[in-house]
Amino acid sequence: MRSLRLLPVLGAAALALAACSGGAPTPEATASSDDSQVPARPVVLNVYAAASLTETFGELETDFEAANPEVDVRFNFAGSQDLVTQLGEGADVDVLATANESTMKKAADAGQVDEQTIFVTNTLTLITTPGNPAGVTGLDSSLDGVKLVICAPEVPCGKLTKTLTDKLGVTLNPVSEEQAVTDVRGKVSSGQADAGIVYKTDALAEGDAVDTVEIQGADEAVNKYPIALVSASTKKDYGQKWIDLVLSTGGQAILEEAGFTPAAK
């Protein structure tokens, strides 16, 4: 019964407080309402980049957005061939970075990109599951009977794999061919495959999740990575700032630390 007697009193008190406030919003509420109507980063910069650039471009994003607080950098990391296909299908892209020149050339020939710049190079290596239980020693007979995964021939890492094996006179018998180098390393690190051929940068990015086996003669096949503004972009000023960061001393240092070779070297 005590609680029943308190309810009218509490209700009256609440009405009194409401009357005193006059229904006016508090300063905090007003500020919150205004803030919700203004995007924190009103400019979106869409960067389409080869899958092998995932870690390094993600690191560069922090520096770029700190220097350009009005910009939200959004990435699409995938196989270079897929990126160019999406661009041709009308995707909203401001900057394109591919893992080889021939794929970028397709976009250039279609008039989809402006002048391109080579910013890094990359080479291949073998990775195995931790401890290398299959006993892989290189592109040799140690791969016989091993579950080997490589990139599909239509994507840059796959083209480079074919170029290298042709030069070395090696024939591979992979159990699968993937559309992105990150898929190759994912199958090895998860134990779905015994070994895979990936870029040196991808092997480093996996850390202790894989073991690395050097490929003798890997330097005979090198991929050059070009970057370019997309011709239809309406944010070329910010796109150029992104490219400038990639080419800067700091940007090149981050890429080199990840295993890439700066184009100037």
Model regions: which residues?
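Sec-dependent bacterial lipoprotein signal peptides
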Residues: 1-18
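Exported/periplasmic ABC-transporter solute-binding proteins
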Residues: 3-4, 20-53, 58-62, 81, ...
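Conserved beta-strand core positions
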Residues: 45, 71-73, 124
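Short helix-capping segments at alpha-helix termini
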Residues: 66-71, 169-171
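Short, high-confidence coil segments that cap the C-terminus of an alpha-helix
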Residues: 70, 92-93, 193
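Pocket-flanking alpha-helical
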Residues: 81-112, 135
